[in-house]
């Protein structure tokens, strides 16, 4: 990650409206990963990441920041929900599986990068194997015959290679030897994923090296052989070592719904997956060693970003030790009508742009007018205020309702409207949503 904090924020601004404090916090945290790697080894070991706690109502961009961050980081990234885990000793997933999943994500990410790097070599090798299947070697009895045969074969091979690359042979059926994949599905109760993975790896390795002849079309065979050759060119041991280092030095874990495992005030009762999960998270965030398929992973330098709405509890309801391990607090603000207006227009692939593109596939044009977008934003804000505040997610509900009739009759409307677009203005929005927005009982159930 060589992007500066300003560049990271600029990239996040393309997709997320507002929430500048949260963007700055994650941008600085990401940049600090790069800064740390420039330090001498002795000092680098002492610099630990400053974990972040994002606090804000639902639908304001907490999870979206995490999603966009994952694409920007080019580092092992995992998003999990705190509610999926239980205290060690109970049925369910324990928190150490977070690091095991992160290790799997790192291995998958690096393998994909390595396969892209060796793709050209794999394609050449795959072409040769397909051509061998298409052009079997003829028997020769003398040296002169062999020389003539070689020259003829070379010309024929070049001709077939050209036709193969142009796709002229795609539908031709050939018989070719490919690796015999051993697919074993093992069902196991929650919390036993590690054992399941080990058993699957064991069965897969037992079948490694076995080959069988299969009749396939050239197009299918080429893809299968290309993947096989690419896997052969990848050094698995080297890949595992790189993945282990990537997890330990650059890994990022985003823990959503952290407020759901906070103890709500003085409420009593069984707290199997509340305080117990928090206490299990402590050593993980502070720094411990977890056994994974890559080996022992130290979590000391993994960045943890936790987020929660905290509408039924407060950050102070988390156990004090966990609060101390999330030193950077960022509050995300509730969305205003102006924010809704910007969300509908400004982000890359905005909601209005998506609906226009979807209906365009039927040959129907729709145009969102400025007054229509403003009215839609006002209704979204009003409904959120009167009922449950679900943030920007309310816009999905409203747009589906607004364009329901148009979507249903798109094919018929396209033939009658020709090139003239349907205008989505304030009057159109009021006629379709105005009554629902005003009637609180209706909006509670429909919007």
From Swiss-Prot:
Keywords: ATP-binding, Chaperone, Cytoplasm, Nucleotide-binding, Stress response. ATP binds at residues 17, 59-64, 256, 321, 393. Its main location: cytoplasm. GO terms for cellular component: HslUV protease complex. It comes from the Bacteria. InterPro entries: AAA+_ATPase (IPR003593), ATP-dep_Clp_protease_ClpX (IPR050052), ATPase_AAA_core (IPR003959), Clp_ATPase_C (IPR019489), HslU (IPR004491), P-loop_NTPase (IPR027417). One of its GO terms (molecular function) is proteasome-activating activity. GO terms for biological process: protein unfolding; proteolysis involved in protein catabolic process. It is found in: Cytoplasm. A double ring-shaped homohexamer of HslV is capped on each side by a ring-shaped HslU homohexamer. The assembly of the HslU/HslV complex is dependent on binding of ATP. ATPase subunit of a proteasome-like degradation complex; this subunit has chaperone activity. The binding of ATP and its subsequent hydrolysis by HslU are essential for unfolding of protein substrates subsequently hydrolyzed by HslV. HslU recognizes the N-terminal part of its protein substrates and unfolds these before they are guided to HslV for hydrolysis. Belongs to the ClpX chaperone family. HslU subfamily. This is ATP-dependent protease ATPase subunit HslU.
